């Protein structure tokens, strides 16, 4: 296998930034140190660029695993944006063999039905069998426009079921029938609340960000789940960041509907650019797309870190005039003349994307 040397970059190893070269050999990171002199098969000059651990997207919808209306080809929606590992949120189709066939590393949160304000685990049980140990959680659409939920009852049932199975819970909370605070009070440490900056009823700003305070105390994970502009109100996002309520993880919720809008550039790099525009630091941003989601998924020993001896999953980013101009569903605008751009992605020690 080709030996890859990335020179002169600012390295993000999942915990901190520092300047060094990175050498890969036989699918692993062989060296991270300054001034590596090596006759590598492939040399990339990362001057003025960031060399990061491969990004981890905790909320995607993969073709063949998600519904036909939503699923997107996983490699095309990941590698060009520096993402080397993903978690499908709401899996309902396909099987373990299909998941294993994808080049991008993956886990899944299986779907669950809610009928007449009660959870139905019939399909969930079947999916858990089909996906095997790839299934690490349950995704709940706690949304009155999508499922038959009227109060907290079905969510309590789902949380009890998940706990009995040793699974995590991820809750889509847009258009929920209860307050965000009540949702968080029902979840356990390590469970995930996604679309936290939505602009509908029962939003994060109620009672001076009460839900976020409870989540931080309980250890419930706050996931941005930006979905471009669909599940994100830019004013709520800006207010939250200015008040110190940052997301634990940044994810795309990318689908075949969102990926090819906005010039076909929507992906993790745009989400990172949005976060930087509203005031998150680079340390906070890169942690939220590498080590933090890896830990949430229980994959911190495999994903999210750039360390010697670890799997050679990494990406190189530039911060350029690749800006964006977005309008959310409530008419609020967010724009920047600059943004992140992935210029190289390495997965399992192979160059898998080059800009």
Regions found by a protein language model. Name each.
Residues 1-52:
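Histidine-rich, glycine-flanked metal-binding segment
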Residues 9, 311-355:
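C-terminal cap of metal-dependent C-N hydrolases
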Residues 9, 27, 48, 59, ...:
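Divalent metal-coordination and catalytic microenvironments
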Residues 46-102:
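Metal-associated gating/positioning segment near the N- to mid-region
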Residues 53, 76-84, 105-110, 130, ...:
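Active-site gating loops and adjacent loop-to-helix segments of metal-dependent hydrolytic enzymes
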Residues 67-77, 117-130, 177-183:
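Short, acidic/polar
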Residues 140-239, 244-261:
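Active-site core of metal-dependent hydrolases
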Residues 236-319:
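His/Asp/Glu-enriched, well-ordered alpha-helical/loop segment
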